[in-house]
Amino acid sequence: MAEKMGILGRKIGMTRIFANDGSAVAVTVIQAGPCPVIQVKDAAKDGYNAVQIGFEEAKEKHVNKPARGHMDKAGRGLFRVLREIRLEAPAEQKVGDDLTVGLFTPGEFVKVTGTSIGKGFAGVMKRWNFGGMPASHGHEAVHRSPGSIGHATFPGKVWKNKKMAGHMGARQVTVKSLQIIEVRAEDNLILVKGPVPGPKNGLVMVRKQ
């Protein structure tokens, strides 16, 4: 799906800043970029418009030969993370250009994609907010169980997407309409209003909306 331009970064953590009226605003600090353009794709040649960007320089011993050859064409060094961003229109950037936090302005709204914090194997009460079984009156060892998961003759199966216990978290999550409160270009920092997915130091993608 076509998107608008974005930049990779790391979630530093949360803090608060004070607005002009004295109110406290909770913000997430993201250290983003600079992200050099490694490859540019266009609809005529590749079937779609996109740019591939790199983030966080890597040592040569940590990059395999195919990736090394691919990144050498851009002449910007080797990177730990490569991400492709599909675009609606042909990219204005060229191979070797840097994408920085200057891409964004305070007040605009962005969407942030990250990997949610992994919680491991979780039961239905924690994972899906089930109410559980009664605490007493004849109920024994079923207090946190899900209850019935299906019927007998019909449908004779468990329905697809039935909410059950399982691995919780560690999934790609996108939060939309986050307002940029401040951009600190000298430190490559973006301050967005509210929380973003993932743990501290987690990889995130910040995109225009």
UniProtKB/Swiss-Prot annotation:
Keywords: Ribonucleoprotein, Ribosomal protein, RNA-binding, rRNA-binding. One of its GO terms (biological process) is translation. The keyword DNA damage does not apply. It holds the Pfam family Ribosomal_L3. SUPFAM superfamilies: Translation proteins (SSF50447). The keyword Ribonucleoprotein applies. GO terms for cellular component: cytosolic large ribosomal subunit. Disulfide bonds: none annotated. One of the primary rRNA binding proteins, it binds directly near the 3'-end of the 23S rRNA, where it nucleates assembly of the 50S subunit. PANTHER family: 50S RIBOSOMAL PROTEIN L3, LARGE RIBOSOMAL SUBUNIT PROTEIN UL3C. Belongs to the universal ribosomal protein uL3 family. This is Large ribosomal subunit protein uL3. It comes from Oleidesulfovibrio alaskensis (strain ATCC BAA-1058 / DSM 17464 / G20) (Desulfovibrio alaskensis).
